Amino acid sequence: MIRYNLTEFFKLSAALNYQLSVSNDLSWNILRIILGDVKLSQEQHDIMLDALSYLNHAYKDQHRRMGPLSVLHPLRATAILSRTVEKVNMLDLLTELLHDKHEDINVSNYPEDKYGKDYYQQLEKEFDHFLYKNDPNDNWYLMERLDLLSRKGEESYFTYIGRLMNRARQTPELVRVKLADRLDNTLDLHSEFYDPIEHTDFFAELFHILYIKNYQPPEPEVQHPIRHPLYGAYRLYQLFKNAVLMSIIRRRQSMSHDAAAQPLLEQLIRASMEEAQRVIIHIFNYHLKDVELQRRLLLDTMDYCQKGGMLEITRPGNRSRLDGLFMNYFEYGSAEEHKQKLDMLYKDKPLMIQTALAFVTIFKNFLLDPNYYIEGIHETGFHPREGL
């Protein structure tokens, strides 16, 4: 089983992107990359190729916020699923490949001035042709899963994940599909090939800051990266989404319905913890270089965590700047408010450090304690205890 750190993620992305660049169609070579060791019949291979052709036409020249082709996301997520979960079947693979169909492939995304007349209708005909060749029973379950995996209108992320986990008792494979989706999204937050995690012993660096009185950190090996759309506060928000997903999974005991997905959960936990570490290393290297300030932030956050601050949702208060952290910066009522809150967090580098340290603690708890989850996270939102 491959451990998907950032390096392995880039290798997978490069292999898929190379195949996309040498052919206008999603080829048999791409299917082999996706399947890994999964064995399919010739008929199933042909159906998978039809699904890939549909995705190729549906995503066409569309790009993700970071810049890569949009079609890479479902391809990578499916490859991660097939290489991480011990036993996957045809329905699992098709569900992962098409999990964003209802959100990404709708008539509003294909304006006539860009795609020509009736392009969306042609896509729907191609999808119907794919369904016609597939097993009718699988089609029923596939369409049900795709509907369940789609957020409905203004549905909050809490409600969406809660609804998915409610259904996991009947359809346990939803857990593995969502975990593979989130693992790919978590790893897809960077374009720079240099990964500070591979060049810095994170916990040794914290030890030096805390215990060596006149410690002088080495200069960073590379210049400050150019800011890109997925800036630090946005990446912290993605970690918040992972913490919500993991907490609801743990609280609902959803992994008991799909124990084979446990390696995916562990990989998502590790990827999330490492992303929080990257945020800290970056800010210490380029923005807050005063070791005394770094030490104060570490000690203050450590004290807050040791007193149980990261065990449950808290309201804003005077105990610490971390009181009410999730409610203050990650809860929002509109897209504009969401952006404003993340911009506020981004400008407050000391709080970003403490937030990232809190996430390192949260994900370490998830890794070490199989019963850990953040109290107060429910499908209806945040519910802190009275007095907190």
Where are these regions (language model features)?
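Active-site helical microenvironments for divalent-metal-assisted chemistry
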Residues: 2-388
